[in-house]
């Protein structure tokens, strides 16, 4: 049978996966460089024509993989499962690890065999006589282990144990390449190891690091008592005895290696509890209403307040989407009203409210994907005559955003620094009247600028007429706008106040169980947001200019967007 390799990504605490609220996920945010590394290693078949790599994976891990991963011609997946399952074009089910290796070795045009997890499968692979190489990504991050976490999946070896194995010449580090994911501020180290002593390393390790020696290795205690064996009495590489003995001895070794050093983060009072209390208040005291687009449970008048110097208020009790929030905000900042611009960037929050059926329903004469003179148009071209989303309005109307920036820079104590999106004369031309309609800004100047050149802090008050509370983006969007303008004007982010008139939850979100899922959860510390540089114009910022550190949300909650 052919030798095989292990490929794994592992964080500082040797964690490879976590389970929260019934969902398994990786213990770090999406890391493009690591995904590209994994794809390159597992799809490269060298010079073999129509070559294929075999992928050995446990059933639970297989269930978490998207179809785009499963159906790649250069990879054939062998799934280890206790149950009988139906094979597919690109995968086969087997019952044991050895059966997986045997089947992989029989594949036509086979290049390499890779074991990709999860934890139990890695454990079997590390103890196997045919293990050849380890491709490990050291993800330089820690996951907050709190009451939300139901299960933590560890790689069987900690980083310190891997280092000791190299020092003792059981493993050899062949190569290491480091990359810094600037946007997440996470260092990645791509490492390749060779197994030097094959199976014998386990016995040698015990001889050197425990009280056992080659004259009295103790076997498992059974009904007939303990039995002692002498290493010199056996030809270990040719007898069946050795493999049974090896299984026992490696269990002892892995008991030594498996000590956990995960970091437990005590729960603290977190600002997101305000949001959770809002949801509870709506559920307990809300009035049921038949509204324009659906039945809601609503309350009138609520306010949230966040100190932006202590964290970026993005939801942690369910996964939010920092890039989508950024792209939608920049779409508005650039005065754009063409939804296809967002769609090309993978953002689809405006699809329903700009569909042909939706526009026809409200007698709007636009092509599909045109929202009319909404958010961004009012922010940058207030008072201009709107034609369609393809027309240029450069130099027309009032640029409220730039006027705000000029006031913040030149007249920071002005009490009229405001962006108003509620233009009554244009409301019937919009696909959707603005849900959030007013940003008001205030500046608190420092007596002396900071060492980094910050002259004060920028505060923001967002006023919103109507809020889909489960979606929850508007707080984060307002915070991000405050961070961007503050950075652009050499200020620190200050206080964000979010005032809502009609705060509501859609009945369909209650009926689907989404709200009950939400209320079972506990929030976490907000991530840190840093903007790496200062651009010439506010329009020029890209998502790669942001660093979002330590964002570890609970799993996403599925909920249909109501148009």
UniProtKB/Swiss-Prot annotation:
InterPro entries: DHFR-like_dom_sf, DHFR_dom, Thymidate_synth/dCMP_Mease, Thymidate_synth/dCMP_Mease_dom, Thymidate_synth/dCMP_Mease_sf, Thymidylate_synthase, Thymidylate_synthase_AS. Pathway: Cofactor biosynthesis; tetrahydrofolate biosynthesis; 5,6,7,8-tetrahydrofolate from 7,8-dihydrofolate: step 1/1. It catalyses: (6S)-5,6,7,8-tetrahydrofolate + NADP(+) = 7,8-dihydrofolate + NADPH + H(+); dUMP + (6R)-5,10-methylene-5,6,7,8-tetrahydrofolate = 7,8-dihydrofolate + dTMP. The keyword Metal-binding does not apply. NADP(+) binds at residues 117-124. Coiled coil: none annotated. CDD domains: DHFR (cd00209), TS_Pyrimidine_HMase (cd00351). Its EC number is 1.5.1.3, 2.1.1.45. Residues 275-563 are annotated as: Thymidylate synthase. DUMP binds at residues 292, 436, 464-468, 474, 504-506. NCBIfam families: thym_sym. In the N-terminal section; belongs to the dihydrofolate reductase family. This is Bifunctional dihydrofolate reductase-thymidylate synthase. It comes from Acanthamoeba polyphaga mimivirus (APMV).
